[in-house]
Amino acid sequence: MNKQKNNRERTPQPEQDTERDEQLTNSHENDIDSAPAAEENDKVADPVEELTAQLAALNDTHLRLMAEYDNYRKRTLKEKSELIRNGGEKVLVDLLPVIDDFERALSNLGDMSEPAAIKGGVELIYSKFMDYLQKQGVKKIETADLPFDADLCDAVAMIPAPSAEQKGKVIDCVKTGYTLNDKVIRHAHVVVGE
């Protein structure tokens, strides 16, 4: 009996052989499967890298567009505020000749022997009108006895200066200049001493 037992242990059983064969086959298949899996991982890694690069490019484009939009928004807000601030410039420029007429009328009324009531009425109208313009941001450019400033004045004539101190200074203002919110809307026409 012992002999039979030993023989059984020595002779491989068909079940054990089958299990060994399956293990060998499985390990061999795993080796074969692992090679394509490594190739697939490389292929999968490439799309991941591509998608990462695309994501970075899209983020960069997005940030640039956001910055561009922010600059556009700031620029349009500035333009709108400038338009609101100086929007009535055309209307006010067209009213400036009326001021000129008032000034001429006042200077001529002083020379005439007209009743004082007419002169007082014209002065009142002129005063109210100038107050209105001042509220709108319109100011006269002061030129009398000041050095000539080409940014504010146009020299229409040059005459010999009556004194040495008046050389290069404004002698007379032919047409008054005006600014709207510190922007020149009409240059003063002046006579300069030389």
From Swiss-Prot:
Name used for this protein in its record: Protein GrpE
Biological process annotations from GO: protein folding
Family: Belongs to the GrpE family.
Residue span of region Disordered: 1-44
Lineage: Bacteria, Pseudomonadati, Bacteroidota, Bacteroidia, Bacteroidales
Subcellular location: Cytoplasm
Cited function: Participates actively in the response to hyperosmotic and heat shock by preventing the aggregation of stress-denatured proteins, in association with DnaK and GrpE. It is the nucleotide exchange factor for DnaK and may function as a thermosensor. Unfolded proteins bind initially to DnaJ; upon interaction with the DnaJ-bound protein, DnaK hydrolyzes its bound ATP, resulting in the formation of a stable complex. GrpE releases ADP from DnaK; ATP binding to DnaK triggers the release of the substrate protein, thus completing the reaction cycle.
Superkingdom of the source species: Bacteria
Keyword Transport: no
PANTHER family with a match to the protein in the record: GRPE PROTEIN, GRPE PROTEIN HOMOLOG, MITOCHONDRIAL
Subunit: Homodimer.
Keyword terms, alphabetized: Chaperone, Cytoplasm, Stress response
CDD domains reported for this sequence: GrpE
GO cellular component terms, A-Z: cytoplasm
Organism for this UniProt entry: Porphyromonas gingivalis (strain ATCC 33277 / DSM 20709 / CIP 103683 / JCM 12257 / NCTC 11834 / 2561)
Pfam families: GrpE
Gene3D superfamilies per the UniProt record, alphabetical: 3.90.20.20, Head domain of nucleotide exchange factor GrpE
Molecular function GO terms recorded: adenyl-nucleotide exchange factor activity; protein homodimerization activity; protein-folding chaperone binding; unfolded protein binding
Biased amino acid composition, Basic and acidic residues: 1-12
